[in-house]
């Protein structure tokens, strides 16, 4: 049985990825942090479709919780697909950004991804596929999310470095940089802000997690 591990796999883009991989025949091990209801809904939907899925509460900034995740039987049986999707975005004005918020964002978005990788890297199959969810903001910055942009930029360089190392071994590493996607991150947008985002998109619509 092929196994996919998706961090932050219980909602938004992560939820859509979990359901798509399940439809492709993978059993799904997804993580969430604190809010279990969305993750449980994704798991129920996957199970109703005839595939197997489990949700695990895991704070990716906590090395102990990440180490515990790595002891899950499905991890021990080898991971075919690893999706590093978790993240946080606090929408803080760059002038108000302080070290506390910067560290919290970097700890979650970048260091959390590294912790997961470090804990499960020896449990990946020889032909494993690793997908890192970055962001277009990682290349262009943001007046209300410089910490988020910096964390995604760090993810991009790290993912490219992994790809250079692991490619010759048969493992593929890719980073995806979504633009505007209709998830919790955009929930606080005003109508005017949403309209301005749409104008930036050639299709003239906000993306969906299923895209």
What is each residue range found by the language model?
Residues 10-11:
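Conserved glycine-rich cofactor-binding loop
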Residues 122-123, 164-168:
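Alpha-helical segment proximal to the catalytic Tyr-Lys
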């Amino acid at each position: 049985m092929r196994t996919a591990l998706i961090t932050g796999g219980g909602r938004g883009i992560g939820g859509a990825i979990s359901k798509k991989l399940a439809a492709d025949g993978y059993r799904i091990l997804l993580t969430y942090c604190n809010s279990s209801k969305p993750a449980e809904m994704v798991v129920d939907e996957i199970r109703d479709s005839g595939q197997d899925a489990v949700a695990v509460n895991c704070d990716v900034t906590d090395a102990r919780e990440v180490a515990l995740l790595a002891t899950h039987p499905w991890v021990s049986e080898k991971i075919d697909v690893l999706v590093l999707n978790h993240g946080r975005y606090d929408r803080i004005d760059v002038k108000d950004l302080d070290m506390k918020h910067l560290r919290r964002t970097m700890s979650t978005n970048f260091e959390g991804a590294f912790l997961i990788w470090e804990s499960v890297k020896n449990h990946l199959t020889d032909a494993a596929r690793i997908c890192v969810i970055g962001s277009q903001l990682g290349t262009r910055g943001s007046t209300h999310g410089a910490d988020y942009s910096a964390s995604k930029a760090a993810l991009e360089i790290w993912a490219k470095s992994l790809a250079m190392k692991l490619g010759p071994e048969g493992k593929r590493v890719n980073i995806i940089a979504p633009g505007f996607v209709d998830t919790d991150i955009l929930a606080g947008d005003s109508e005017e802000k949403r309209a301005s985002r749409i104008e930036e998109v050639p299709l003239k619509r906000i993306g969906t997690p299923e895209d």
